[in-house]
A protein has these predicted regions:
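Right-handed parallel beta-helix/beta-spiral solenoid domain characteristic of secreted/periplasmic
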Residues: 5-17, 53-82, 87, 92, ...
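Acidic Gly/Asp/Thr-rich repetitive segments characteristic of extracellular carbohydrate-active
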Residues: 3-32, 108-160
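Extracellular beta-strand/beta-solenoid scaffold signature
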Residues: 131-132, 170-182, 201-217, 226-229, ...
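Interface-prone segments of viral and bacterial extracellular assemblies
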Residues: 24-26, 104-105, 140, 240-245, ...
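All-beta strand scaffolds that present successive hydrophobic residues in beta-strands
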Residues: 52-55, 69-83, 102, 161, ...
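Flexible, charged surface loops at secondary-structure boundaries
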Residues: 23-29, 45-48, 139, 148-155, ...
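N-terminal extracellular ligand-recognition/capping segment immediately after the signal peptide
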Residues: 30-67, 132-189, 195-209, 230, ...
Length: 553
């Protein structure tokens, strides 16, 4: 570039005049712009429509409000090539000094750095500002759509992450809402080297905002984020892995979204709703998404793993490891949102393959009511992370105002209280919205003084159709107050509970379609009170007594 007249690259003299004069020559000769090492001060706008190669040490320095637009290829490695004064934390909607329309971009171009050893994360500079700058390079300036919405200037390219750990001292936001205006993004996303290779390490463990990584207000073109991890860590804190943030990652108010191979960990601060629902500490919160697909998500050492609120989403393969309350929840569990009991969201979710290991409560938890789900391949192992003790309370939990319908199938081993409990006011299905359960349950070890079962349905409005294989259980198979439910049961080594019965039916109707109960230790097949139990006559025998309580039929 120094071949061009008036291109000095000393960081003092304005090189914009020389570069603008040199570009037409390069276009006519079908040549690229080659920038050799030096500081190129730019005080006037430049638009470059040909490829640009930055040799290491070549840095463009826009000042005086100048904007540079790159409409073709940028050839540069993982080193700094832009020196800008943009502050998108102070003014996220401000004009950007650099616009890149032609290629994917790198945070390193704006000064981000990585380190291989996370324990030395504080030895490198904070990359937060570089991430804001590289994102705004992909959006250009925000342009008005109407009086309440602005949109990125062009379709965004992706941000390419390198191997290693990025130090992030501040949150990362993308689309946002400010002063009554939505600033939306059109396409773009992130592509990393793999969820264990490209890692954003957030160090502000005392931060209690909504999220560390917020990708919201995306629309029109496809948005794709794949192949990286977000985590919380600061070696100077008493607990270096304990973050108080509402969620590690938040994806909100977006359509056309793909989230693949993403790993989140470290959100550990619980805050209770007035009704006792435990929120906070979300690994990934999905909020108000349409046309969303996901694949290979890993959430570990959080309070709530993944949560869905007002989403239409389809995906495969979620892994939850050592999360305190849930691995897969429904509702918005970020504390700044209204209490779960006040949320009126609706989810339509399909997932194949959900693995839970060492969850401390209920791996699958329905906090809100209108959840229509198809979940297959749910695999739960309730043993602790570092021992054989059982820590998982129950496979499926429902809040006092929560509910679910659709179908769920899977296997759960080593739980304390079995499969599901509607706690009397939650909805495990409802009229016209049956919940279909098909499960293999093995190893139920809890004990309780009052009536309690592997399937515990005490809300008369719940409606279930259950196929259950149950073995090695200290609790009976089912307690039902449901007005109408059905059960097909195969059981082995199942205790009879307080009524010494495999099944208890109270204040409702239960149809048993099939029963294989060889080897169980209960004294009675069923106890029926204020309800009707219907089953094929062939099931009843001298060894299968049914005891009728008051008004039992």
């Amino acid at each position: 570039a120094k071949e061009g007249e008036n291109i000095i690259a000393d960081g003092v003299n304005n090189d914009a005049v020389g570069i603008n004069a040199f570009l037409p020559v390069l276009v006519d000769e079908n040549r690229e712009l080659l920038l050799v090492p030096g500081i190129y001060l730019v005080n006037d706008d430049i638009t470059i429509d040909i490829p640009v190669t930055f040799q290491p040490g070549a840095i463009i320095k826009p000042r005086n409000g100048a904007q540079l637009t790159f409409n073709s290829e940028i050839r540069a490695g993982c080193y700094k090539i832009f020196d800008t004064e943009d502050d998108f934390y102070a003014e996220p909607e401000a004009k950007t000094s650099i616009k890149i329309t032609g290629v994917n971009v790198r945070p390193e171009w704006f000064g981000a750095t990585t380190i291989s050893d996370v324990n030395a994360i504080l030895n490198i500079a904070d990359s937060s500002s570089a991430f804001r700058k590289v994102f705004r390079a992909t959006t250009g300036d925000f342009k008005p759509i109407n009086s309440t919405s602005y949109r990125s200037e062009f379709i965004c390219k992706k941000i390419e992450l390198s191997n290693g750990h990025y130090r992030m001292d501040k949150p990362t936001t993308h689309g946002f809402y400010k002063n009554g205006i939505f600033y939306k993004i059109d396409g773009g996303g992130y592509t990393g080297k793999g969820m264990g290779n490209s890692i954003l390490v957030y160090t502000a463990l005392q931060y209690e905002g909504n999220s560390f990584f917020d990708f919201s207000y995306g629309s029109w073109e496809m948005h794709e984020l794949t192949g990286f991890k977000c985590t919380a860590y600061n070696p100077l804190e008493d607990d270096p892995y304990y973050a108080r943030v509402g969620a590690i990652m938040l994806f909100g108010s977006t359509d056309s979204l793909i989230t693949n191979e993403i790993w989140a960990s470290g959100a550990k601060y619980i805050r209770n709703d007035p009704d006792g629902t435990r929120r906070g500490g979300v690994g990934i919160q999905f909020e108000s998404l349409v046309d969303h697909s996901f694949c290979n998500l890993l959430i570990e050492h959080c309070i709530n793993g993944i949560a869905f609120s007002s989403c239409i989403s389809t995906g495969v393969n979620i892994k939850g490891f050592s999360n305190t309350i849930s691995d897969f929840a429904f509702g918005n569990f970020i504390p700044e949102w209204p209490p779960v009991s006040e949320q009126t969201t609706s989810n339509i979710i399909s997932i194949s393959g959900l693995e839970s290991k060492a969850c401390g409560a209920t791996p699958l938890f329905f906090g809100t009511n209108e959840n229509n789900v198809v979940i297959t391949g749910l695999l739960i192992d309730g043993r602790a992370e570092a021992s054989l003790s059982t820590v998982t309370y129950q496979a499926i939990g429902i809040s006092k105002s929560g509910g679910v319908h659709g179908s769920i199938s899977g296997i759960a081993v080593n739980t304390n209280y079995g499969l599901i409990d509607d706690i009397g006011t939650g909805s495990a299905g409802s009229t016209g919205k049956t919940l279909y359960l098909n499960f293999v349950i093995s190893g139920v070890y809890g004990s309780i003084g009052s009536e309690f079962s592997v399937i515990n349905i005490t809300n008369p409005q719940s409606r279930l159709n259950v196929i259950l294989s149950l073995s090695n259980s200290s609790l009976p198979a089912m307690l039902s107050y449901s007005s109408y439910s059905t059960l097909s049961l195969s059981s082995l080594h199942v205790d009879g509970g307080t009524q010494d019965a495999l099944i208890e039916v109270k204040s409702g109707n239960l149809i048993i379609n099939s029963l294989d109960d060889s080897g169980s230790t209960y004294g009675k097949l069923a106890y029926v009170e204020d309800s009707v139990l219907i089953m094929p006559a062939i099931i009843i025998s001298t060894n299968r007594n049914i005891i009728k309580g008051a008004n039992g039929v």
